[in-house]
């Protein structure tokens, strides 16, 4: 039982001096002067309770920290357009960054490929829970996003190889071609 907190309830309401009862990791009641019962009590006077935060652009698990080559799988930089790769296949659930994010209140994370490619692949939305596999972290029913980057990263990565795109106009030309190819594929 968390007592005397300033609570933001996720609907825009602020509740001062509020109580929040949590059972088995889920909020089961909220209000003021809730009965304690057999619950452990935490005095949260001067502290805030908020819904879990959602990180909509993260590279946790695909660029693990501390970084070593074996866990740096965020960019498939073999072609400027790698729409067929999925970030979830590179997620390392033991990345210590997940625990750090959770300690800061981040409970849901969209993991995206890096920005080295024009079209870097599909992202995945995960629940930030301790797990041994990314499948155990997947957020049920979450939509997938497609990572696209238009700017410094693709033109730097490929320009340094004397390959297109090496300019922003090359970036946009690459998008046009990728979209035309996708239309033809349909």
For the regions a language model picked out, list residue spans one by one:
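Histidine-rich, glycine-flanked metal-binding segment
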Residues: 7, 11-50, 67
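Sec/Tat-exported extracytoplasmic proteins
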Residues: 9-11, 24, 31, 53, ...
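Active-site gating loops and adjacent loop-to-helix segments of metal-dependent hydrolytic enzymes
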Residues: 66-91, 129-132, 147-149, 154-157, ...
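Polyanionic/metal-chelating signatures
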Residues: 97, 102-186
């Amino acid at each position: 039982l968390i007592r005397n907190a300033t609570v933001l309830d996720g609907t825009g309401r602020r509740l001062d001096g509020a109580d929040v009862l949590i059972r088995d990791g889920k909020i089961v009641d909220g209000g003021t002067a809730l009965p304690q019962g057999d619950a452990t009590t935490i005095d949260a006077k001067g502290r805030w309770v908020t819904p879990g935060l959602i990180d909509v652009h993260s590279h946790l698990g695909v660029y693990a920290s501390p970084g070593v080559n074996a866990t740096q799988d965020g960019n498939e930089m073999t072609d400027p357009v790698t729409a067929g790769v999925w970030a979830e296949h590179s997620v390392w659930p033991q990345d210590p960054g997940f625990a750090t994010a959770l300690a800061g209140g981040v409970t849901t994370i969209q993991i995206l490929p890096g920005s080295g490619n024009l079209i870097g692949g599909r992202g995945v939305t995960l629940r930030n829970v301790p797990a041994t596999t990314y499948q155990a972290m997947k957020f049920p029913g979450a939509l997938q996003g497609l990572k696209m980057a238009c700017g410094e990263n693709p033109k730097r990565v490929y320009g340094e190889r004397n390959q297109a795109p090496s300019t922003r106009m090359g970036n946009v030309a690459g998008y046009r071609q990728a979209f035309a190819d996708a239309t033809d594929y349909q």
